[in-house]
Amino acid sequence: MSESRSLAFPLRCVRDRQQAEAELQRLTRRTQTSQQKDVQGRVDVILKAVRERGDAAVCDFTERFDGFRPDPVAVPKHQLEQAWKALPENLRDALELAHRRISEFHQRQRPEDIRMEGAHGEQLGRRWRPVQRAGLYVPGGRAAYPSTVLMNAVPARVAGVEQVVICSPAGSNGQVNPVVLAAAHLAGVHTVMRIGGAQAIAAMAFGTESVPKVDVISGPGNIYVTLAKQAVYGQVGIDSLAGPSEVLVIADQSAQPEQVAADLLAQAEHDPLASSVLITTSHQLADGISSAIAQQLEDHPRREICEASLRDWGLVVVCDDLETCAQLSDSFAPEHLELLVERPEALADRIQHAGAIFLGPWSPEAVGDYLAGPNHTLPTCAAARFSGALSVETFMRHTSMIQFNRAALDATASAVCELAESEGLHSHAESVRKRLS
């Protein structure tokens, strides 16, 4: 029997529903920091400078923040293929498997055009077309996120986007992580720019001498990237405003404590602002989860990050029944929802709001992060109430098609004119009458 261990801090645990709802609301507001106004001011300065000075401003900010001057801004195309060929075989195989599965799933997302004939022979429809250029932001520097490359580039390529551009910050040596370059090669990305931060978002939104102006920007980033995306929305499309990651685990007495602990830590290791929540009907699991977490935290390479996340944004809730668990989950609308219960399919049917649902003990969130197939770019901070995962449609737009004939216009003219006149739009009505006079 393993020795019982305890966390260096108490993991917040509540057993009252009203208190649980208040705690979950607190977690959804964790990005609302006092620093946000200061950061927004700095972001606005960066956006204005890049809009006015182009590459020169991008290079100045990169030199200031990242310690090198990106001249040229673009990574030479041959370096992407070189990076792919230089990968260890096991990593190359893993990326190919992920790429294949993600591609197969997203191919099924391609929307179909709609065509219908009205009562008088008029032709009506909706036509889908890809955007021309997509800009993908991939966090970088000391870390490598090839999964972010695949999860953004694959749907863009499946959509049929003509030009896919990645911006990813380089290290102080001026080099983008080779695994990111390799994934970009595999996914068919056209260009990689070795720039990051708000200046990269500005470059893609406004265009510079080196960076083409794009139609849609997708991909996660820090608060500078998120606020920059928010500021340029309307001039370009964006996927979403990503906040810190989160997981909510609903577990009953059948759940294994060590698996639950591992899944909570898998979220906590992302970021000190990441949120890990356990809602359970098992008092035994609730009482023992701290010990299971403490045991796995020993010698954890990201222990400080995990502890900060769990201390500030971790939560355990004990409920009387799974119906209450589902209701509390819906009030939180988690990015990731794991159902570690005896009948996960039945519980999933009760869930209304979640970015992604992982059913049963063999579906850890990690498989969704890397290669299950559905996209891992998901709404956070309760945005799952009104939005969903990044998809092929993120990189497409639809156009309405209307072709009336004389009979259709004859049959509907009086109603059109009546409605136009009721709104005081005389010329609208006249545009119909002139065709029939």
Swiss-Prot record:
Disulfide bond sites: none
Catalysis performed (reactions): L-histidinol + 2 NAD(+) + H2O = L-histidine + 2 NADH + 3 H(+)
Pathway(s) this gene product operates in, as recorded in its UniProt entry: Amino-acid biosynthesis; L-histidine biosynthesis; L-histidine from 5-phospho-alpha-D-ribose 1-diphosphate: step 9/9
Keywords, sorted A to Z: Amino-acid biosynthesis, Histidine biosynthesis, Metal-binding, NAD, Oxidoreductase, Zinc
One GO term (biological process): L-histidine biosynthetic process
Cofactors named for this entry: Zn(2+)
Binding site for NAD(+): 137, 199, 222
UniProt keyword annotation of Amino-acid biosynthesis present: yes
Record carries keyword NAD: yes
Cellular component, GO annotation: cytosol
The protein's name: Histidinol dehydrogenase
Gene designation: hisD
